[in-house]
Each structure stands twice: as structure tokens, then as C-alpha cells.
A protein has these predicted regions:
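An interfacial alpha-helical scaffold signature
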Residues: 1-172
Length: 172
């Protein structure tokens, strides 16, 4: 069987997040920053990763991960050699920025802000944060920014989706 790339959730769309981002960049204010953060913590992202072992595909086309499958997330580094996990906002952005090494297949895994918190805020994490669309919008969310966001989340919950309170990572 030929090796193939897996792109999970090709319909993932973060239109509202991108609008909030563009608004924040065009008219920076506490309100536009808050709107962006609120959308970011409720969004799902596509993150490049290598899966070991490679998943099998069922007759129905479903992917089957073996117990103990290891997920190695791809990262980018800045000039100071700090590593940042990658958060693409949609399949189009992920596809145009494929990150494959010789002999390896890079898949795309759905992640959330909470997933990034669990990975990055771990005391032994090699990551300094994550970057949203690193080859276009290039919005860097550092460990320190994540800690500030999380402190504020604990103080207040911001409604999203017509006033319904949702936990970060529950989707748009």
C-alpha cells in the first residue's frame, strides 16, 4: 500500500477568528483583542504531525490508530531558536504550507487551544508557544500570553455562540 497523507477535518473553517484577527490588526483596542482571544480559545486548528506507527485505513475509509501511537507535532523556530507549534486555521492554509521531510509523511491533526495549553504549559515542554498561520498571518501566542489568558479565563467566562457559555476548545 502506498503511503498517503491524512488531512483530518478538511471542512474546518475559522472565518470568524480570521475576521477578529484582521479587525484587531486594523484597529487595535482592548475590545478587538478580547474578541480575537475569545474566538481563538474556542477555535479548532490543524497542526502538522508525524504519527508512529502510521495509521491503518478501514474498509469504510476511517483511520485506525494503534494503541500507543506517538504523535510528533511539527514546529517552527524563530531567530532565537525558540520552537512554536503550528496552528493552521483551515485545510487550504495547511495544504499550501506542507512540511514534509524525506521518507516521512506529515499528517494534519485537529487541535484546540486547550491542547496547546496541555502541551506548551507543561513544565518540561520544549515549546515557547504556538503560531497561527505562520506563513501568512503569523500570529505568535507565547507561553506567557497563554498564562495571562488562562488567568483571565478563570476570573470570568466570556459568552460565545449567542450568549451560550462554552469551554475553550468546544468549537466555533
Amino acid at each position: 500500500m502506498a503511503k498517503r497523507r491524512i488531512l483530518l477535518d478538511q471542512d474546518l473553517n475559522n472565518f470568524d477568528l480570521i475576521v477578529a484577527l484582521k479587525t484587531m490588526q486594523g484597529r487595535p483596542s482592548p475590545q478587538s483583542q478580547g474578541d480575537f482571544i475569545n474566538h481563538m480559545i474556542h477555535s479548532r486548528f490543524l497542526t502538522p504531525a508525524v504519527l508512529d506507527p502510521e495509521p491503518e485505513q478501514s474498509e469504510k475509509g476511517e483511520l485506525i490508530l494503534s494503541p500507543g501511537t506517538k504523535i510528533l507535532f511539527r514546529a517552527v523556530s524563530n531567530a532565537e531558536k525558540k520552537a512554536f507549534l503550528i496552528a493552521f486555521t483551515d485545510a487550504k492554509e495547511a495544504e499550501k504550507n506542507r512540511m514534509e521531510k524525506e521518507g516521512e509523511i506529515t499528517h494534519t491533526v485537529v487541535t484546540t487551544y486547550l491542547d496547546f495549553c496541555n502541551i506548551i504549559l507543561n513544565e518540561h515542554s520544549p515549546y515557547s508557544g504556538f503560531v497561527i498561520n505562520p506563513f501568512s498571518e503569523n500570529v505568535i501566542v507565547t507561553r506567557e500570553i497563554m498564562q495571562d489568558i488562562n488567568r483571565n479565563i478563570k476570573v470570568r467566562q466570556v459568552p460565545l455562540n449567542n450568549g451560550k457559555k462554552t469551554a475553550p476548545g468546544d468549537g466555533n
